[in-house]
């Protein structure tokens, strides 16, 4: 997709959202089925079924997907798509890869130490870019990618998560 194609695809959406701001508000959904046979949750992604389970550092076998890895994968996917979209808009020639890593202290989630954080204490996202573009353009590309990456901004902003249940 080139810049003209991207603009053609996004133009009517941007115009509609300017005229009808409420049309831009969309609720995304995900759901999973609890596995009664093992400590796992089966998540339908729309493309495939992912079975998530315990990380080996919490007693899992490593045979199932780890939710923490899935969070980093979502960040990599979003940041990669955002970078490609921004690069296309800026008409920059950029290729490469995206890498994320995060630090966890599993004492927190296992309840071993109440002072230990439950969750990532730091996440690092890195782009390894192949490009002949000037550094100032790549700096701007990174700045705009960070600004418009939905998953990155959600993590950085610390959005509230409401836990609830219902019974049947």
Label each residue range with its predicted role:
Residues 1-73, 85-168:
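Extended beta-strand/beta-hairpin segments
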Residues 74-79:
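Alpha-helical metal-binding/catalytic segments enriched in His/Glu/Asp
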């Amino acid at each position: 997709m080139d810049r003209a194609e991207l603009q053609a695809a996004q133009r009517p959406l941007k115009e509609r959202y300017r005229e009808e701001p409420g049309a831009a508000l969309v609720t995304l959904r995900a759901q999973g089925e609890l596995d009664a046979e093992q400590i796992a949750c089966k998540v339908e992604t729309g493309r495939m079924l992912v079975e998530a389970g315990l990380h080996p550092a919490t007693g899992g076998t490593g045979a199932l997907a780890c939710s923490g890895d899935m969070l980093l994968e979502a960040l990599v996917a979003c940041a990669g798509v955002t970078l490609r979209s921004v690069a296309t808009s800026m008409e920059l020639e950029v290729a490469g890869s995206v890498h994320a890593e995060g630090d966890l202290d599993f004492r927190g989630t296992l309840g071993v130490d109440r002072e230990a954080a439950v969750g990532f204490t730091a996440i690092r996202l890195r782009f390894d870019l192949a490009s002949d573009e000037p550094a100032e353009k790549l700096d701007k590309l990174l700045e705009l990618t960070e600004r418009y990456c939905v998953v990155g901004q959600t993590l950085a902003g610390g959005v509230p998560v409401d836990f609830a249940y219902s019974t049947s």
